[in-house]
Swiss-Prot record:
Protein name per its UniProtKB record: UDP-3-O-acyl-N-acetylglucosamine deacetylase
A Pfam family assignment: LpxC
The protein's role, per its UniProt record: Catalyzes the hydrolysis of UDP-3-O-myristoyl-N-acetylglucosamine to form UDP-3-O-myristoylglucosamine and acetate, the committed step in lipid A biosynthesis.
Positions that bind Zn(2+): H78, H237, D241
EC primary class: hydrolase
Native source species: Acidithiobacillus ferrooxidans (strain ATCC 23270 / DSM 14882 / CIP 104768 / NCIMB 8455) (Ferrobacillus ferrooxidans (strain ATCC 23270))
Active-site residues per Swiss-Prot or TrEMBL entry: H264
Biological classification of the source: Bacteria, Pseudomonadati, Pseudomonadota, Acidithiobacillia, Acidithiobacillales
UniProt keyword annotations, A-Z: Hydrolase, Lipid A biosynthesis, Lipid biosynthesis, Lipid metabolism, Metal-binding, Zinc
UniProt GO molecular function: metal ion binding; UDP-3-O-acyl-N-acetylglucosamine deacetylase activity
Cofactor(s) the record lists: Zn(2+)
Catalytic activity: a UDP-3-O-[(3R)-3-hydroxyacyl]-N-acetyl-alpha-D-glucosamine + H2O = a UDP-3-O-[(3R)-3-hydroxyacyl]-alpha-D-glucosamine + acetate
Enzyme Commission code: 3.5.1.108
Length: 304
């Protein structure tokens, strides 16, 4: 059977919050089977815990933020994407602030931390959510949908009237039975427009954003000296974000997710609709030889 996974060891890192601009320490720790991904705010007296769950999403302005009562954890999507890409089912995430650090704006630093900690298979079957009926959420010309598919595939399209984005391509499909999350998705960085920076900061957003943790474009070009990591890095990052948002379900998906000009808000609307439509999905597990796609197998050991 395909087994659940956790971290082999605890590991720590540090960075700044994209929106808060504050330094944050992050720790990733092993967790027992069927725990899921649970965030721990160590800066709150007595500690405060909140599980990654679509129903805990409280804000989707430029990032996915979860909350439960007075507890908030912001910008969870890049870390969640890395956990999904490496097949981590169970982990505790310790934070001494209100936001997951942005690192370099992609999922790659979180992938690196997880790889350094090591990955351990646990003695319990990994449960997948298999999509059995199509489901769609839309807002004007923006939409996201899930369809039955024996594997995991993500398609996304953006539509920005910008020369760099037009030249690089604004559509992509990634079939994870045929290619690697680590190669095709993990290094794609978040992006923003220089003309919007001041307005965002007046709203208390993007206070920690800079050329080290985001692609920044003016009206004509990319301002980062190193340029792009992929010619279509902008739309690949939307794939990265979507994978992170989808993983709030707590289980890997078997199905085809597609999106058009969408973002975190529609992703969450789709997940909430899915949870209400129990006829549109089912829990499944797989023997190794029958798995419709595989996860990265770097540094994986088996637990006793």
């Amino acid at each position: 059977m395909i087994r659940q996974r956790t971290l082999k060891n605890m590991i720590w890192g540090t960075g700044i919050g994209l929106h808060s601009g504050k330094k944050v320490y992050i720790g990733l720790r092993p967790a027992p089977v069927n725990t899921g991904i649970v965030f721990h705010r160590s800066d709150i007296e007595g500690g405060a815990w909140i599980k990654a769950d679509p129903l805990h999403v409280v804000d989707t302005r430029l990032s996915t933020n979860i909350g439960d009562g007075h507890i908030r954890v912001g910008t969870v999507e890049h870390l969640m994407s890395a956990l999904a890409g490496l097949g981590i089912d169970n982990a505790y995430v310790d934070l001494d602030g209100p936001e997951v650090p942005i690192m370099d704006g992609s999922a790659a630093p979180f992938v690196f931390l997880i790889q350094c900690a090591g990955i351990e298979e646990q003695n319990a079957p990994k449960r997948f959510i298999r999509i059995t009926k199509p489901l769609k959420a839309e807002d004007g010309d923006r939409w996201v949908q899930l369809e039955p598919f024996e594997g995991f595939k993500v398609s996304f399209a953006i539509d920005f009237d910008h020369p760099v984005m037009k030249n690089g391509g604004q559509e992509v499909t990634v079939d994870f039975a045929r290619t690697s999350y680590l190669k095709e998705v993990a290094r794609a960085r978040t992006f923003g427009f220089m003309r919007e920076v001041e307005a965002l900061r007046r709203m208390g957003l993007a206070l920690g954003g800079n050329l080290d943790n985001a692609i920044v474009v003016d009206d004509y070009r990319v301002l980062n000296e190193e340029g792009l990591r992929y010619t279509n890095e902008f739309v690949r990052h939307k794939v990265l974000d979507s994978i992170g948002d989808l993983y709030l379900l707590g289980h890997p998906l078997v199905g085809h997710f597609s999106g058009h000009k969408a973002g975190h808000a529609l992703n969450n609307s789709l997940l909430r609709a899915l949870l209400l439509r129990q006829d549109a999905w089912e829990f499944v597990d797989y023997a190794e030889r029958r798995a419709p796609f595989s996860f990265a197998d770097t540094l994986v050991t088996a637990s006793a």
